[in-house]
Amino acid sequence: MSTAALVEGKIVQCIGAVIDVEFPRESMPKIYDALILEGSELTLEVQQQLGDGVVRTICLGASDGLRRGVVVKNTGNPISVPVGKPTLGRIMDVLGRPIDEAGPIESENKRSIHQKAPAFDELSPSTELLETGIKVIDLICPFAKGGKVGLFGGAGVGKTVNMMELINNIAKEHGGYSVFAGVGERTREGNDFYHEMKDSNVLDKVALVYGQMNEPPGNRLRVALTGLTMAEHFRDEGLDVLFFVDNIYRFTLAGTEVSALLGRMPSAVGYQPTLAEEMGKLQERITSTKKGSITSVQAVYVPADDLTDPSPATTFGHLDATVVLSRDIASLGIYPAVDPLDSTSRQIDPNVIGEEHYSITRRVQQTLQRYKELRDIIAILGMDELSPEDKLSVARARKIQRFLSQPFHVAEVFTGSPGKYVPLKETIRGFKMIVDGECDHLPEQAFYMVGTIDEAFEKAKKIQ
């Protein structure tokens, strides 16, 4: 604590989550200083200096019962949270306080949630692939170790289930540490995730930070930074860490709420004028350095399925791979509902993934694109009017479409079918056989919800 720790101020105005505090003019708190209420655990974070000793703060917690004249103390430092191994296996809130009723977190290390992004010469780009065991992702939009991935989708198309499956497949195989930041999502999902980790015996390798949708906007805005600070610490210790965020859109939305409360003019669609800067500050810190790596998977809600909305559009530019979930594909009953024509990855390069993988990916996309173009003709004139080549393309595309589906481990409870982990070699072999015409004699139902291509052959025997 600095010498300013003794400085006291008084609340002069309360408007929802925004609190104005008056300090002596010669000792005003700095921007991002943490203020604490006397006799309470409530923390305020300084956002603006209004002049005449008055600062405007955002409340990290419920502001019920606050009134003018209440004494506030300046800690003289930004919000700091515990980092390191003591955080593993624990659930924490935005201030790093435990909320799992398992006693205090005995961490000697504390770190400010506001850190500078690593300098350009410290960064370390990676081309090593990270196998996920999910066919459509490994084939169409492969992940890089130490890269950033976004799961884009509207309401109810399966972002959280996809993320849970990725955590299930990567975190368990990975063996390193993971940090999960629940930003403005359902408390039920946070609870389910905790028990999922506990049941699979990987809880001692995961730090969980929650600021759920029932919490004030200040908590939801800062909880992503809290989780990121913990992940950065592991990275700076020379470790490879996984960082999961569900959901980045809620971070933006909390920023919008705070911005409006602070009296800033809204910009496009009512978002905060500082949207790009806030997103950039967060995303530039999620990066891999020469010391260690952060591999990040972020769910991004797409309002009204509009990918051009400022929030998802701002996120796109920061990512190495984008997995776009489509309502049209979900309506066909194909899960994961990943759109193979909309999803992209910087790893799709023959020099990175190899010539065979690259050519199979492109042939699969060409076949699906041809089917998309022919759909209108089929709807009006029927299949009989197509040329033999086009009929073959359509048949193969429908098989590819169904083969891109896969039963998930985390959805076993709902589907009743056991989850499948498909190695990358098997994925490439399966799709190669389909585009090469080796499966033309099989019915398309045989490809639905199977793992490897061998399972499709077995299923075909049962059907026939």
From Swiss-Prot:
Organism: Burkholderia thailandensis (strain ATCC 700388 / DSM 13276 / CCUG 48851 / CIP 106301 / E264)
Alphabetized InterPro entries for the sequence: AAA+_ATPase, ATP-synt_VA_C, ATP_synth_F1_bsu, ATPase_a/bsu_AS, ATPase_alpha/beta_chains, ATPase_F1/V1/A1_a/bsu_N, ATPase_F1/V1/A1_a/bsu_N_sf, ATPase_F1/V1/A1_a/bsu_nucl-bd
Gene that produces this protein: atpD1
Subcellular location as annotated: Cell inner membrane
Protein name: ATP synthase subunit beta 1
Disulfide partners: none
Reactions mediated catalytically: ATP + H2O + 4 H(+)(in) = ADP + phosphate + 5 H(+)(out)
Enzyme Commission code: 7.1.2.2
Mode of membrane association: Peripheral membrane protein
Role summary: Produces ATP from ADP in the presence of a proton gradient across the membrane. The catalytic sites are hosted primarily by the beta subunits.
